[in-house]
A protein has these predicted regions:
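Conserved beta-strand segments of alpha/beta enzyme cores
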Residues: 29, 78-80, 132, 206-208
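A short, conserved acidic/glycine-rich loop-to-beta-strand motif
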Residues: 129-139
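A structural signal for short hydrophobic beta-strand segments in well-ordered beta-sheet cores
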Residues: 30, 149-151, 209
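Conserved N-terminal catalytic core of the sugar/cofactor nucleotidyltransferase
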Residues: 2-10, 18, 36-110, 121, ...
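Active-site metal-binding loops of divalent metal-dependent hydrolases
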Residues: 15, 112-113
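Catalytic-core segments of class I nucleotidyltransferases/pyrophosphorylases
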Residues: 51, 106-107, 114, 119-127, ...
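Short catalytic helix/loop segments, enriched in acidic residues and glycine
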Residues: 25-37
């Protein structure tokens, strides 16, 4: 399946407080991992998956990211930028703000996630699911982070990032797909988080689930940063094709 026409919204506008002092003067996307800015590793991975278009949703120190990565040509990518503006919009608000650049359907990933799975398979599952949104999940069993999803193999029954319980053996993998009309009733240019939006989608039976088998990596914490640095020094991100 060709993914060249599938845009990716990459949410990288947060303050990254858990990584301070590393992020006091630079955004999380520019934190060095295996001797390169983390965003460079993300772009190489996306390129290897056949993706060519990325919309960076930026807030805190976003101008530094644009200055370093420009139009993305050095990575074989077409990068566009969507800035929050005077106030940070949160993950949901930033996505709503970027909709004019995203088209009818698009991937969403987070600016601190490294997700080595098969994106074409995820896209095909979305096209077959008949719903306007799809969350990929991983059977985490509270190993690498707190599991926050109850999933029966076909449907996402519950999502709760704030108050997870033992019935939740899966975790939001961090790779999701939306149709743009999913956000039709969301406030424009007002802050909100995707974590607040998912339970409403579940209630309205609009959120499909798809299980991936590859574990996730993240740099949202010092531990995650060290773990990914170790991985990438031994197994670098895929080369650009």
């Amino acid at each position: 399946m060709c993914l060249e026409d599938w845009p990716v919204a990459l949410l990288a506008g947060g303050l990254a407080t858990r990584l301070r002092p590393l992020t006091e003067k630079i955004p999380k996307a520019l934190v060095k991992v295996a001797d390169a800015p983390f965003l460079a590793h993300q772009l190489r991975l996306l390129h290897a998956q056949g993706i060519r278009r990325v919309i960076l949703c930026l807030g805190y120190l976003g101008e530094m990211i644009e200055a370093q990565f420009g139009n993305g040509a050095a990575y074989g990518m077409n990068i566009e930028y969507s800035f929050d503006g005077p106030q940070l919009l949160g993950t949901g608000g930033a996505l709503k703000h970027a909709l004019p650049a995203l088209g009818d359907q698009f991937f969403v990933i987070y600016g601190d996630s490294y997700l080595p799975t098969n994106y074409a398979k995820v896209a095909q599952a979305f096209l077959s699911c008949g719903k306007p949104a799809m969350m990929t999940v991983f059977k985490n069993e509270h190993r690498w982070d707190t599991s926050n999803v109850e999933f029966d193999g076909k449907e996402i029954l519950r999502y709760d990032k704030t108050n997870p319980d033992k019935t939740m053996q899966y975790i939001d993998y961090g790779l999701n797909i939306f149709r743009s009309d999913t956000f039709a009733n969301c406030p424009g240019d007002k802050p909100f988080e995707l974590a607040e939006f998912y339970p409403d989608l579940i209630f309205r039976n609009q959120l499909a689930g798809f299980e991936v088998k590859e574990r996730f990596y993240e740099i949202g914490s010092s531990r995650g940063l060290a773990e990914l640095d170790y991985l990438l020094r031994r197994s670098p991100a895929p080369a650009q094709s």
